[in-house]
């Protein structure tokens, strides 16, 4: 084995691991290993990748790298391994100046299988031209075999970025970084600008790989209960002296941006999703310090919390209550993902030429903060939030180990100390001392903002025709290319399309890839243990979990909904809980109190179908805090639930407008989810309720606040108040999750809370199912489509068949048809046993009618039994990996509590998992035949101009 030199070893008792930092001397690359008792093993290899333009070369390379390698000569090893392993996470990330390839699994055999595939992919990829065309960009005729049809650009990344750059948040971010970093790679769009992607060549892509995907430019990160030396030997054997060390002086690094002499003014157009979003937006952004310096990083986080944590924070208060705009911007606060730290503040809903007013408002605010400083209460609250953030094992979509590893990445990327970025106790202690020193925080305000010339003032200008202009420009380019093509060139293009389609349709030799068998999968899984806390005839539920010193709490109440007006009122009320005042506190005081004792109090709603098929629902408030604040936070949660004040019409209007803007900006990123919910809502009662709560139909509830029509607002608030007055009739439930048991004194205090111990949920609103095909316009450059059918609920004996069918359709049919051939960024099938719906969807899709036809064809394909036992095994592995995927300790407890409350006991879930493992081919064919024989609903959100119809 090559020489791995141990550079450093640090015990991190706060987060429960020992960090080891190794140097592989042969290549001068580092291995960061976080040793702990976690069964979820995580690996990540990261390369510095520094693009010179916005062709998306790093992004397209990330995709193409995973399309076959020297050892694994199959077209799509990445997606194949998703279903041949028990991975709890597999992905690849392209950032502004790095590319990473992470995975996680709880199976050690699986870990080394995936390690083999990943290392072969990044170091020895095939990078074939057909894969470049499929994943990046290509020219094709709209009708592949007819050169008389329109010429089109296709490609997975091309369509992904058309969708991405339709989103105002992404457009704003690119505008800010372009102007903040005129000399650095950050000025480019590493994902790719659609108009520039088509300039990328296959040869340039291969050269980019050769330059950056080298062991000397790599850092390896690992986490879990696995020996570092075992991993190091595997990496050594894989590399096998096939590379020569590149001296550090020859490697490329991102340098510091030169200081500005004066702030920069900039203007950029953006694409509003709808006419309601046509207001201007104004921003100011500063570069502060460097992300790999733990002291600068913590200082910046503390200042960001002090300024923006809640409505009582001085800068956030100004952004909410000024007379220039209607709400704080969606992009707000500290960004620490690059070498330079960036702080952003902004407002939405302004008028033209408001930038100077906004700049003066911000300058005045910082001058006042420097003069007055922060109160002791504000400082303690911000430090408390830092402490909570440090301790929390969050329930992110990323594995916890990967979250920790990514937090250390700046130290490795910029040749600093990665271990210092995770072991922050010493730096945090020093920051706490400094924060209370006179003038310290005011000096940071001056240094970061007042005296800092490294600032961009950006005006975002709405243009409802921006998408059409881009499409017209692209059409002119394509028509020009076509008019200059010879007959032979057109024929070659037709033949190239046929060749690519034949390649996509060819059956790969999957057996070259490693895989698990069912006997590698545990027969059963473990669940968190629960117990009831005896109080006074009411028993809160308690889970003792390793929460790293935090306590999590949830208080919930049964819902009674008898009309669509009730659903709309619930949506509004949920957005207001904790954000408006209570009977005894105005909203500023309430926000301040919440921040002092907790990590925030958040409202959510959950609906489910019980065993009898009836829809039930609950509203919940949840929080996290240090154990000493258990009683105080619980009392505050019940105060909010029972005594919220709904009289401050101005505040409510501000909050609802903020919610609307956030909702609008989520549409492009989550268009497939809106389409699935919309399609299911046409024929399924539970989905109908959910769609009116959080789908596009919910926009109607925002209408009075967007138009600011006083009479409409008054009328709606009257309905909300009426609904709220009946809310407390529902039964209360309470949950605690902690590694600290509640003391007898705390239980005594909780006894004094006014609980409602009786009641039941009843969602009885009228619903008339229908099956329709609906197309709705959406101002983006791509489409989102979904189809939905009735299916059995969780408790039905045949339910496991549909779970496997959905996985089979996604992996074996829709991935090929919708993504590879159709060019969509994503597509698949999803069975929801909790609502009783079976859905198919596409994401950032250039097509829509053809995609719906593919959805229909998938069921015919499955009903004919056009799959083998190996396909079934892969589908089972894919499903079981989702079921077995661990969450955070608190997340596991929340999930168990919710399912138990829905009569899905641990025993029933264990049996359900067992039944999934026993599904046969005949079962799958039977399920497909039943679905195929049904009517379905379909919804497409499309950029095409079509006759439209409302969803409901």
Pin down the residues of each PLM region.
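His/Glu-based metal-binding/catalytic segments typifying zinc-dependent metallopeptidases
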Residues: 35-37, 44-46, 158-170, 248-312, ...
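Conserved small/polar residues in nucleotide/adenosyl-binding loops
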Residues: 942-948
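Non-catalytic, conformational "gating/processing" segments within enzyme and secreted inhibitor domains
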Residues: 154, 206-238, 687, 715-750, ...
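M16 family metallopeptidases and their MPP-like homologs
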Residues: 40-50, 76-124, 131-142, 170-195, ...
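Non-catalytic terminal extensions that flank enzyme cores
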Residues: 1-42
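Active-site recognition of the HExxH zinc-binding catalytic motif
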Residues: 55, 60-63, 67, 575
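Extended, domain-scale alpha-helical bundle/helix-rich regions
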Residues: 440, 447-456, 465
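Hydrophobic, small-residue-rich alpha-helical packing segments that form membrane-like cores
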Residues: 154, 160, 171, 175-177, ...
């Amino acid at each position: 084995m090559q020489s791995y030199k141990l550079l450093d070893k640090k015990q991190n008792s706060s987060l429960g691991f020992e960090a080891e930092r190794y140097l592989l001397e042969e290549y001068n690359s580092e291995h960061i290993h976080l040793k702990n008792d976690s069964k979820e093993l995580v690996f990540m290899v990261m390369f510095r990748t520094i693009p010179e333009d916005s062709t998306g070369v790093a992004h397209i390379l990330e995709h193409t790298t995973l399309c076959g390698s020297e050892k694994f000569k199959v077209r799509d090893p990445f997606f194949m391994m998703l279903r041949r392993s028990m991975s709890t996470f597999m992905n690849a990330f392209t950032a502004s100046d790095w590319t990473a390839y992470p995975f996680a699994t709880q199976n050690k055999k699986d870990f080394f299988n995936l390690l083999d595939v990943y290392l072969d992919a990044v170091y020895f990829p095939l990078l074939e031209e057909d894969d470049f065309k499929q994943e990046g960009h290509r020219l094709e005729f709209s009708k592949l075999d007819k050169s008389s049809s329109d010429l089109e650009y296709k490609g997975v990344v091309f369509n992904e970025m058309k969708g991405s750059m339709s989103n105002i948040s992404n457009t704003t971010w690119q505008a800010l970084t372009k102007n903040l970093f005129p000399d650095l790679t950050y000025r480019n769009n590493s994902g790719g600008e659609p108009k520039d992607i088509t300039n990328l060549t296959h040869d340039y892509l291969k050269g980019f790989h050769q330059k950056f995907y080298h062991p000397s430019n790599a850092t390896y990160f690992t986490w879990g209960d696995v020996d570092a030396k075992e991993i190091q030997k595997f990496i050594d054997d894989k590399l096998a002296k096939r590379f020569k060390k590149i001296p550090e002086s020859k490697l490329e690094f991102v340098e510091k941006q030169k200081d500005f002499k004066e702030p920069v003014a900039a203007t950029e157009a953006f694409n509003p999703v709808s006419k309601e979003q046509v207001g201007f937006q104004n921003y100011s952004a500063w570069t502060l310090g460097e992300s790999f310096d733990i002291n600068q990083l913590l200082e910046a986080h503390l200042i960001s919390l002090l300024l923006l944590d809640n409505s009582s924070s001085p800068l956030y208060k100004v952004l909410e209550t000024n007379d220039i705009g209607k709400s704080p911007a969606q992009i707000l606060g500290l960004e620490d993902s690059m070498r330079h730290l960036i702080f952003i503040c902004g407002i939405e809903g302004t008028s033209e030429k408001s930038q100077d007013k906004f700049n003066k408002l911000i300058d005045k605010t910082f001058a006042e903060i420097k003069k007055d400083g922060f109160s002791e209460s504000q400082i303690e609250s911000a430090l408390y939030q830092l402490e909570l953030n440090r301790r929390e094992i969050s329930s992110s979509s990323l594995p916890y180990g990967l979250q920790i590893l990514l937090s250390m990445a700046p130290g490795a990327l910029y040749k600093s100390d990665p271990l210092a970025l995770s072991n922050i106790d010493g730096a945090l202690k020093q920051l706490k001392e400094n924060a209370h020193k006179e003038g310290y925080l005011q000096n940071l305000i001056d240094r970061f903002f007042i005296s800092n010339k490294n600032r961009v003032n950006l005006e975002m200008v709405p243009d409802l025709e921006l998408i059409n202009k881009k499409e017209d420009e692209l059409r002119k380019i394509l028509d020009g290319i076509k008019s200059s093509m010879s007959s032979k060139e057109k024929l070659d293009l037709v033949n190239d399309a046929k060749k690519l389609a034949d390649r996509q349709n060819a059956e790969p030799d999957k057996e070259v890839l490693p895989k698990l068998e069912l006997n590698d999968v545990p027969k059963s899984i473990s669940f968190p243990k629960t117990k009831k806390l005896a109080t006074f005839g009411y028993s809160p539920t308690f889970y003792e979990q390793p929460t790293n010193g935090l306590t999590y709490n949830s208080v919930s109440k049964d819902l009674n909904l008898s009309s669509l007006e009730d659903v709309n009122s619930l949506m509004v009320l949920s957005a207001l809980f904790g954000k408006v005042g209570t009977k005894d506190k105005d909203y500023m005081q309430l926000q301040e109190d919440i921040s002092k004792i907790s990590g925030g109090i958040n409202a959510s709603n959950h609906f489910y179908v019980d065993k009898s098929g009836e829809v039930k629902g609950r509203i919940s408030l949840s929080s996290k805090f240090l154990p000493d604040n258990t009683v105080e936070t619980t009392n505050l949660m019940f105060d909010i639930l029972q005594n919220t004040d709904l009289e401050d019409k101005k505040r409510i209007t501000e909050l609802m407008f903020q919610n609307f803007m956030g909702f609008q900006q989520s549409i492009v990123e989550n268009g497939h989810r809106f389409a699935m919910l919309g399609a299911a809502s046409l024929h399924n009662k539970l989905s109908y309720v959910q769609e009116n709560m959080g789908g596009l139909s919910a926009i109607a509830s925002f209408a009075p606040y967007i138009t600011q029509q006083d009479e409409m607002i008054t009328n709606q608030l009257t309905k909300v108040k009426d609904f709220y007055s009946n809310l407390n009739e529902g039964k209360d439930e309470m949950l605690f999750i902690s590694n600290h048991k509640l003391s007898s004194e705390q239980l005594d205090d909780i006894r004094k809370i006014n609980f409602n111990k009786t009641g039941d949920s009843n969602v009885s609103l009228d619903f008339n199912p229908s099956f329709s095909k609906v197309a709705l316009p959406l101002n983006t450059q791509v489409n989102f489509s979904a189809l939905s059918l009735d299916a059995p609920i969780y408790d039905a004996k045949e339910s496991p068949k549909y779970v496997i069918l959905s996985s089979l359709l996604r992996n074996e049919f829709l991935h090929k048809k919708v993504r590879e051939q159709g060019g969509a960024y994503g597509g698949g099938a999803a069975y929801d046993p909790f609502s009783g719906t079976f859905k198919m969807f596409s994401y950032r899709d250039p097509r829509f009618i053809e995609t719906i036809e593919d959805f229909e064809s998938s069921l015919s394909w499955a009903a004919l039994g056009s799959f083998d036992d190996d396909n079934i095994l892969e589908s089972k592995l894919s499903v079981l990996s989702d079921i077995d995927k661990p969450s955070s300790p608190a997340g596991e407890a929340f999930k168990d509590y919710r399912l138990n409350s829905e009569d899905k006991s641990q025993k029933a879930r264990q049996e359900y998992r067992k039944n999934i493992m026993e599904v046969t081919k005949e079962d799958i064919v039977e399920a497909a035949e039943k679905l195929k024989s049904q009517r379905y609903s379909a919804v497409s959100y499309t950029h095409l101009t079509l006759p439209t119809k409302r969803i409901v």
